[in-house]
Amino acid sequence: MRWDDFEAACPRIAGIARERFGQDEVVMLGTVRTDGAPRLSPCEVDVAAGRLLFGMMWQSRKAQDLLRDPRLVVHSVPQTRMNPGGDVKLRGIAIEERDPDVRATYREAIRARIDWAPDEPGFHLFSLDVREAIYLRFGEEPVAWRWDDAGGCRELRHPDAAT
């Protein structure tokens, strides 16, 4: 599901994700290496053109992973050990973005954020086709929400909840 459709389907998780990703400007991106092992990499993220976009250096390992096997996991960066903002976790499929208009919109978004943008065609650009989203917050007010296409957006029993 494209990001703008996910925002409509589950505004609760999407809103927190957008806020966190905008604040942190980087996420942890999990890909699958050629040997099948997981690879975890920091990656800048931007929302533009109705998509959650990840720009990567040309021929980087994580980009090569996604070109070969598009499965990925996105995890918000914990703010502190106690992480009062909670964890946002997204699972889905990477879509290589070749459309010149989408790439231009991404470059405008990143330039507005950090006063720099990669030159064409020297970077990879992927968007996330969201398949599952989870938000967990621990502590005094624990929260557990999940979204997937089959079950929609729902609250779960939190792992810290008293039995």
Residue ranges of predicted features:
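Charged, gly/pro-rich active-site loop segments
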Residues: 1-12, 84-163
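Short, conserved active-site entrance elements at the starts or edges of catalytic domains
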Residues: 3-34
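Short beta-strand segments
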Residues: 24-58, 64-66, 72-78, 86-89
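A generic "binding-loop/recognition-motif" signal
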Residues: 58-59, 131
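Short, surface-exposed beta-strand-loop junctions and turns on beta-sheet-rich folds
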Residues: 60-62, 81, 142-144
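Short secondary-structure boundary segments
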Residues: 78-79, 130
